[in-house]
Amino acid sequence: MIITAWSALSPYGTEDQAFAEGTTARRPLPHKPRPVPDFEPREYLGRQGTRTMGRATALSIAAATRLLTEDMDPTRTGLVLGTTNGSAQSILEVNRASRERKSPHHVQPSSIQNATMNSIAGQTAIWHGLQGPNATLAGGTTTGLLALGYCRRLLLTGRADVLLAGAVEELSEARTWVRSGTAPLAEGCALVRLETDATGGLAEVLAVTSLVVTDGDTKTAVRRAAERVLDRVSPGQVWATMGSGTGEDAESTALTTVCPQATRLPPVTEAVGQLHSAAGAFQLVTALTRAAVSGPGDRVVLLTSVEHQGIVAAAVVRIKGENVVA
């Protein structure tokens, strides 16, 4: 499975280059909620069809726009998108309206579509005319890596030729109520384009896996997941490891045990902020940008992610030694 392009709208800016430069230089961001700057959906996407569009949907549509080309067959192109619960703000507003208005059914119909979990993926596909598989995943911080595994199965079974995979989170009042950790809340959308028959490409996903922690031993679970995906490369071939940061010392210790000589890339939460379900997708594109400036030659990166409810995911990616700014 080949990564042929990527796109990211982040607190560093609306352009991919801004994200690449910000993460590689580790440019500091304000220690407060971090929106995507200068992103107004109606100005960015146009006024038609955006009056009632949710912010997360607009971010997803904007990111997908950069990854689609005219020669792609829309019937064979799909989208696998991660989210925590869709637009938390829209869910809150619909529930509030159903309680505060004269009757529970006196809710603005146009607001309901943004309050369903799979609305963002569906609206993105409709906007771009994609007719391939369309799926929404919700696996917490592991969602981005889980999406890679989901796409791998779709591609291997011939369900699609091209898939966009990633995750999106919007910054809203409602989301501040589910804040976790100490990093400032952040929003954004990160997507990669995945193909099987592409020549060249930016990177190859060698393996991806996930498992459930049933005994509370996160360290052992991370180690097992990492060892499982390292079946095509040896630990000594791994250039860098990158954890999610949510597993704290257990995750870091496990990565050191499995790949003691590898470079440690800091968790995406340290640079970008708390992205919740979008963390894994941003973790992947961060690894792509960091490898691109590390010098010539391919780089193998081991990614792991830990969701506090008991999910662990891991992936191994071989990144080609070339500029990977899409």
Regions found by a protein language model. Give the residues of each.
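Membrane-interface segments at transmembrane-helix boundaries
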Residues: 137-138
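Internal active-site segments that recognize and position negatively charged phosphoryl groups
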Residues: 150
